């Protein structure tokens, strides 16, 4: 039900009962006696007696004046909605429309008015279903009318086509329900005679229907006295300002006629047409839609009852914010122009170029935030507004502005026109399809042009929106007939490339916030409205992209106001892009919730003093201080109530949550010991093998094909490099052919049976160092190198079984960053040293001034003569065979040393700078990544072509046999006899091989388990799990068996494994500009590793091509691996700090939290351990360097903990490396791991 306070013409006298009109003889009305009793009962005297009796029982303080506190209580509670008189009567007194009974006379319809009576004009219609439900709920408590025929009860209601009637019922004292409160205007007019401004009132007709006849607080009596009416009392929440129940200010006539009449005449017309005097049969006037925005749905005007208006779900979503400013276009016509947007960070439109600038953190002025808070405190706030189109929202916003006294009634049309102006975006000029921005006026003309219909088929605005005509008729009802989601007929537009690209960056299920700010001169002061729609809807031609809109913010005002509208718009946009604030905006129930959220935002904001900043280094403290504020904000967020936050409050809930988290963590920890033999291995099998079939199904993705090509070259290049160097170290007993076959066979088996198929197994630098040391040991003791490797492989299998049975993989947790960095730094130094050692050796064999010196050779004199004669005319055929196995290497060749230096340096610099190019700013990202990922093969190919083009200079080539053959067929075969090839192998060495087996096992264990730890980090979001015990057993066992065939041992290659995982990682496309990419999923499958292993094995057939690779090129790759391995090693960075003054130290944790001398002491201890390892490597005991390396683990756990505090150790020895997926300059996979290549 809806009603409104009436303005009496003459104060309290207007409530006097007029003389009853005589009814015609044919009128089927009440008898005259009953009619007289009705008039006497409904007269003002009887009405005032009821109020006085109720007021005396209410205990209200006489002569009380109402102040701001009463208003605040009145507005913040549910009582601030004005109710008609009928809602203050007890439930049994408010009779609803009921079906005609046999003893009840039929009611009169408007068309059947008596002769001589003026017919009524329809006003509204009440909901039949709600009336029947309310009648059914009150039926048991209502006494029968027949039981008390002498008493009369009155009721008020509005029905379309029905008059207000009074029937005889049982007496009931008029009382208020406990949750109701007498509206101040209910008695003010009768008691004081003060005119009351006419307002639009929304009343709940079923507010107390569920309580039946419950007794409550009686009506209060208002003593005579004047009280000014406050317009603030007419405020209401947005859910009660919907189009179904919005009753707008009643205008007695059209505006053109009202301008010619005096105020007294208008008041008289209002009194005559709108007053509702009790006991008098009067006309009901239908509202005139002219000059106001009338909205209705099926003619109903139901009140906002809880049953008919359920609360909308307020689940927070991701947001997209767009700032539109009211500016003039090139034709000097006003329009809404997009000037900024927020996905996570702010992006501004550059005025000169009309293109988007770089994303940045929004910097706001403190004054604009205070102005925003002030406008929100006094402006219009509409929450849960039920509208589907922009015109519908605009009508409700404008009317709420009038109600809240922000704008004058005559400014309604101008504000409405401003809200419905055209929207333009920077991308509009780039689209060559159908224009996307269609205003309401142009849309009407467009539809009329396409369909050939008259004015009746035009849409909702019949007058131009941009103009000075004050009379605008808006028909929202016709607008509602068109589904909001259906596009206009004949208008279809495909999304442009710009829209598709922007939609990829916006999170899924995001909802938009539209901010409209501008300067208009027709307003005398600023006006503001904050709107939250009940459901997110797509508003046509408003946003740059089709995203449903949930929030709108409007701020209009004159230029004379001391207010920066642009900065306030940026402030509310930044607030809405803030996660905590927009969640609070979703959950807000009233204005105070928004103001509280602004205060919380201000509490965590940073204010910079107005001083000049000379350099960016001066702002470092700002970032640090902001991180502290954000940490404090997160801690406060954990203390939210259970209804709002996820943190349990009671001690029992916290203890239970901790137990559940601990149990889940223990269950997911693959290194947790079970206490049973092979318990970890069994858990690995049970965890990983159920996903075996999905490991092949998940490979059906185009990204896996690209990963196969990339990882193939990433695996082949080290195989060729290490194979060539290993052949140099072992005199071709193990070379390129053996390493390629070992990589292929072990790779296939591991990809089929392994627990973590993302691992790429291959040869590494530490194994190369051990192979060289063991070959030197066997050569010096006259032992067969390959036979000794067979017995080492036998002990390796036994050691692996023992370690897996005892679940010893957990020991990898004790290998801290202290040991890893020493290990990685040692291998990098060995790589760099070996490169220059080989280069110096080439210069010694081929000196620069050796042209006048007679050539010499390692072969006999005949071969010497051959090389001397061909030294200057070495053709391609001879050059390609110059490095064949079994042939001697010439000495003293001219230009060989210089060419080798050029090839080595060129390979290194090409590979190094292509790696840097990957994260540079040139070319699109996809092209850069392809070039950077294939940097090593590109460098090898370029330098091979350079060497091939220089035909008259000798260079040593890679020794690769033709076909499926070992590197040196004259020295060994494919099967190695464990008892000895040329002589019996000593028995004591069979047993003593246990010692070198332990050393090899240490190297394989460290590399494999640390690599698995890096791959299995939580940040990578792997779903199928890993298997430390199963992978270790497979790799070591395969290495032991391969030793029988003279193949090298392999381990999990750290860099190649991380590169493989990164290639199979799918990053989310919905990444806000300026934000870090997030992992969407990882293609955990076995097919890519399997195909890579097969392709590496098939590479043996390209022996002719591999034989064209000079060894100097491999030395360049060796140098490249040594230098790049130093990246990300904190030990290497702290060595630089030894030579820097403290003021130039970087802003990192181990610098800020640890004193400089203590930090240098830790670096010195690491340097001492590194020197000890290098000394061991330089002696005959080089075979034992893994044992010295493993001693650094107890050194760190026992000795360093006594020298440094726990806090210092956490800063100096913490593993802070995170997976790297974004394109930061100078950062890639090498920065993630302190492990050797």
Swiss-Prot record:
Residues 122-133 have a biased composition (Acidic residues). Signal peptide: none annotated. Residues 1-237, 281-316, 445-464 are annotated as: Disordered. Residues 704-1237 are annotated as: Membrane (anion exchange). The modification N6-methyllysine is found at residue 270. The chain crosses the membrane at residues 704-727, 733-770, 790-812, 822-843, 897-914, 930-950, 984-1006, 1032-1053, 1087-1132, 1159-1195. GO terms for biological process: negative regulation of CD8-positive, alpha-beta T cell differentiation; negative regulation of CD8-positive, alpha-beta T cell proliferation; osteoclast differentiation; regulation of actin cytoskeleton organization; regulation of bone resorption; regulation of intracellular pH. Glycans are attached at residues 855, 864, 878. The modification Phosphoserine is found at residues 113, 144, 170, 172, 239, 439. InterPro entries: Anion_exchange, Anion_exchange_2, Anion_exchange_CS, Band3_cytoplasmic_dom, HCO3_transpt-like_TM_dom, HCO3_transpt_euk, PTrfase/Anion_transptr. Residues 137-151 have a biased composition (Low complexity). This is Anion exchange protein 2. It comes from Oryctolagus cuniculus.
């Amino acid at each position: 039900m809806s009603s409104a306070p009436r303005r009496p013409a003459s104060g309290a006298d207007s409530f006097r009962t007029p003389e009853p009109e005589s009814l015609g003889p044919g009128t089927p009305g009440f008898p005259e006696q009953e009619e007289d009793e009705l008039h006497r009962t409904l007269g003002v005297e009887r009405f005032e007696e009821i109020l006085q009796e109720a007021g005396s029982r209410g205990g209200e303080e006489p002569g009380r004046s109402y102040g701001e506190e009463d208003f605040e209580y009145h507005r913040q509670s549910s009582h601030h909605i004005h109710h008609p008189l009928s809602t203050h009567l007890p439930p049994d007194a408010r009779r609803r429309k009921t079906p005609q009974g046999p003893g009840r006379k039929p009611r009169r319809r408007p068309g059947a008015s008596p002769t001589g009576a003026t017919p009524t004009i329809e006003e509204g219609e009440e909901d039949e279903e709600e009336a029947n439900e309310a009648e059914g709920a009150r039926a048991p408590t209502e006494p029968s009318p027949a039981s008390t025929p002498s008493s009369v009860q009155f009721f008020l209601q509005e029905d379309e086509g029905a008059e207000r009637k009074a029937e005889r019922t049982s007496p009931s004292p008029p009382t208020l329900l406990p949750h109701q409160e007498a509206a101040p205007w209910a008695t003010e007019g009768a008691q004081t005679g003060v005119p009351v401004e006419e307002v639009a009132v929304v009343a709940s007709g079923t507010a107390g229907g569920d309580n039946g006849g419950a007794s409550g607080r009686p009506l209060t009596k208002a003593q005579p006295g004047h009280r000014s009416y406050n317009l603030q009392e007419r405020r209401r929440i947005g859910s009660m300002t919907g189009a179904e129940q919005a009753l707008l200010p009643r205008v007695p006539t059209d505006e053109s006629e009202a301008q010619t009449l005096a105020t007294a005449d208008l008041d008289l017309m209002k009194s005559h047409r709108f007053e509702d005097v009790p006991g008098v049969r009067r006309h009901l006037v239908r509202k005139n839609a002219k000059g106001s925005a009338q909205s209705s749905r099926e003619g109903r005007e139901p009140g906002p009852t809880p049953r008919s208006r359920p609360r909308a779900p307020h689940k927070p979503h991701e947001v997209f914010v767009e700032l539109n400013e009211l500016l003039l276009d090139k034709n000097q016509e006003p329009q809404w122009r997009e000037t900024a947007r927020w996905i996570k960070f702010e992006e501004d439109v550059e005025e000169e170029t009309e293109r988007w600038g770089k994303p940045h953190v929004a910097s706001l002025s403190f004054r604009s935030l205070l102005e925003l808070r002030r406008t929100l405190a006094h402006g219009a706030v509409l929450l849960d507004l039920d509208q589907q189109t922009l015109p519908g929202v605009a009508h409700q916003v404008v009317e709420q502005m009038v109600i809240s006294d922000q704008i004058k009634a005559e400014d309604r049309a101008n504000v409405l026109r401003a809200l419905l102006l055209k929207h333009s975006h920077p991308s509009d000029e780039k689209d060559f399809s159908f224009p996307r921005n269609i205003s309401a006026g142009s849309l009407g003309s467009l539809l009329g042009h396409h369909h050939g219909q008259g004015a009746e088929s035009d849409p909702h605005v019949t007058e131009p929106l941009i103009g000075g005509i004050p009379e605008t008729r808006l028909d929202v009802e016709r607008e509602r007939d068109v589904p909001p989601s259906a596009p206009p007929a004949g208008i279809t537009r495909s999304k442009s490339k710009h829209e598709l690209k922007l939609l990829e960056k916006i999170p899924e299920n995001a909802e938009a916030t539209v901010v409209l700010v501008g300067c208009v001169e027709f307003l005398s002061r600023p006006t503001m409205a904050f709107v939250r729609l009940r459901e997110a809807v797509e508003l046509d031609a408003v946003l740059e992209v089709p995203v449903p809109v949930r929030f709108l913010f409007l701020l209009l005002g004159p230029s004379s106001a001391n207010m920066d509208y642009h900065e306030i718009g940026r402030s509310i946009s930044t607030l809405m892009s803030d996660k905590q604030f927009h969640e609070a905006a979703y959950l807000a129930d009233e204005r105070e919730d928004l103001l509280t959220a602004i205060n919380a935002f201000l509490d965590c904001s940073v204010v910079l003093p107005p001083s000049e900043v000379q350099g960016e280094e001066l702002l470092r403290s700002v970032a640090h201080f902001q991180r502290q504020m954000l940490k404090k904000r997160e801690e406060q967020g954990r203390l939210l109530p259970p209804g709002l936050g996820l943190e349990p409050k009671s001690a029992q809930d916290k203890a239970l949550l901790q137990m559940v988290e601990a149990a889940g963590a223990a269950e997911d920890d693959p290194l947790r010991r079970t206490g049973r033999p092979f318990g970890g291995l069994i858990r690995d099998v049970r965890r990983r093998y159920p996903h075996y079939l999905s490991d092949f199904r998940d490979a059906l993705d185009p990204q896996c094909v690209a990963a196969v090509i990339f990882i193939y070259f990433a695996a082949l290049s080290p195989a060729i490099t290490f194979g060539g160097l290993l052949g140099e170290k072992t005199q071709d007993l193990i070379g390129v052919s053996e390493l390629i076959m070992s990589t292929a066979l072990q790779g296939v088996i591991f990809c089929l049976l392994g627990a973590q198929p993302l691992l790429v197994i291959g040869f590494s630098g530490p194994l190369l160092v051990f192979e060289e040391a063991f070959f030197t040991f066997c050569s010096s003791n006259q032992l067969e190198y390959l036979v000794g490797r067979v017995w080492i492989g036998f002990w390796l299998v036994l050691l692996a079984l023992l370690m897996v049975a005892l679940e010893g993989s957990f020991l990898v947790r004790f290998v801290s960053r202290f040991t890893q960095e020493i290990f990685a730094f040692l291998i990098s130094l060995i790589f760099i040293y070996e490169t220059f050692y080989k280069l110096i050796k080439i210069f010694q064999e081929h000196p620069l001034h050796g042209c006048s010196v007679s050539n010499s050779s390692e072969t006999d004199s005949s071969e010497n003569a051959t090389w001397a004669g061909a030294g200057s005319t070495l053709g391609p055929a001879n050059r390609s065979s110059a490095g064949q196995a079994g042939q001697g290497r010439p000495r003293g060749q001219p230009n060989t040393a210089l060419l080798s230096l050029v090839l080595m340096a060129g390979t290194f610099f090409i590979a190094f700078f292509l790696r840097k190019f990957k994260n540079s700013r040139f070319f699109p990202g996809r092209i850069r990544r392809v070039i950077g990922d294939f940097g090593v093969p590109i460098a090898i190919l370029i330098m091979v072509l350079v060497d091939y083009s220089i035909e008259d200079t000798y260079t040593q080539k890679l020794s690769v046999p033709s076909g499926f053959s070992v590197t040196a067929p004259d020295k060994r075969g494919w099967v190695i006899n464990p008892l000895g090839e040329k002589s019996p192998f000593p028995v004591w060495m069979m047993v003593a091989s246990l010692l070198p087996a332990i050393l090899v096992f240490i190297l394989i264990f460290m590399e494999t388990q640390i690599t698995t730890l890096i791959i299995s980090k939580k940040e990578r979001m792997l779903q199928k799990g890993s298997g430390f015990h199963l992978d270790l057993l497979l790799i070591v066992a395969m290495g032991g068996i391969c030793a029988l065939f003279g193949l090298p041992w392999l381990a999990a290659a750290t860099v190649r494994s991380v590169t493989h995982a990164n290639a199979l990682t799918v990053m989310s496309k919905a990444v806000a500009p300026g934000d870090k990419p997030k992992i969407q999923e990882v293609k955990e499958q076995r097919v890519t590793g399997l195909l890579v292993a097969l392709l590496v094995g098939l590479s043996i057939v390209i022996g002719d091509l591999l034989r064209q690779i000079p060894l100097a090129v491999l030395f360049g790759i060796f140098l490249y691996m040594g230098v790049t391995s130093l990246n990300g090693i904190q030990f290497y960075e702290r060595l630089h700090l030894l030579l820097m003054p403290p003021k130039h130290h970087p802003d990192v944790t181990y610098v800020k939290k640890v004193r400089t001398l203590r930090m240098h002491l830790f670096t010195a201890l690491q340097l001492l351990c590194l020197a000890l390892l290098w000394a061991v490597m330089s002696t005959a005991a080089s075979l034992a360097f893994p044992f010295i390396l493993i001693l650094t683990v107890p050194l760190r756990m026992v000795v360093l903990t006594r020298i440094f505090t726990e806090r210092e150790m956490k800063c100096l020895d913490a593993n802070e490396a995170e997976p790297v997926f974004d394109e930061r300059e100078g950062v890639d996979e090498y920065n993630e791991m302190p492990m050797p290549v």
